[in-house]
């Protein structure tokens, strides 16, 4: 009996010994899931597009800082991003699993940025249990380092003026000045984030560094540039209506709508339609590109981080101009001066018209993704499938960005000038980020 007993005891000890020494495997799939989880929370909590860009960028930066420590491929963003001057050093002999620590940092920073913290915690706890069961020692060491980096990023994040802008005065609508923005149907919401240009930039010198060309002067003269641009929106809207809902212009407009403030009226009740933000859509494209290219964990984090930095900067630059020029939306001027029954294909979002946010951030994102994955990277975009829309194929990131930009014209919510100048603005931002940030060695 004794030999059998000792053999059994040895087998048990060997099992637990091997289990303890097994390194925890963290994959790109885990990181995609973490970003997807944040996107889903934003659908639940309904954050504005500018605020959503902030929720995406800081967790990604936290994760990137972890994987950049002692890396032979990536450089820390320390002293590259405004105000980010120190990151806790990583002891290469401490046994830290950097992928695990990166995810810990991402989740910890995410939790502070959303309302539904319990959703982050549920996702986090499921990973923590799996990791702890695999190798508790490695998990605890790695978690501790991830939390240290997260705390440093949260401290830096807290100085970006976001909290201060929550207390600033609401936007005042100037109805006595012709051509100024006014709230639009159906909800007639207040203008969102009128002080977003006060948020600290990450790479840009200031919110106005890439100030676009001045907006068109308001004029109802039928020979004026402004009047003809209004008429162009009116005419394309009527033309699309005649073609019907199955036409390509409708498909393009709906695919890139990305308006978290879209509402549906039923009787006396108003319901919000669940839609991702424009930044959320481009985060989805990062996922698609990373998966198609079989990017490893580190490159996946790098792609999300660099793209989310571009989106964040794009919103600050774009919003700086929106509330400088305060341009009236097509829907308002068409209803007042041309056709009181005309409606745009898409609901008009609640902020001034110039420049087109989709044009700015999509162009910037495409430039950054070209830099990471190469030009002419074809892909199938299935980001909108959960929202009842089909896939769309694109020959390149630039192809997708141009379609995103023109979608706002088809949707009846932007003039051509806003789209064209927004593309130029986004190009300037994207080129600047690519040239200034040295994230790879």
Locations of the language-model features?
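Bacterial Sec-dependent N-terminal signal peptides
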Residues: 1-25
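Acidic/polar surface patches and capping/hinge elements
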Residues: 19-441
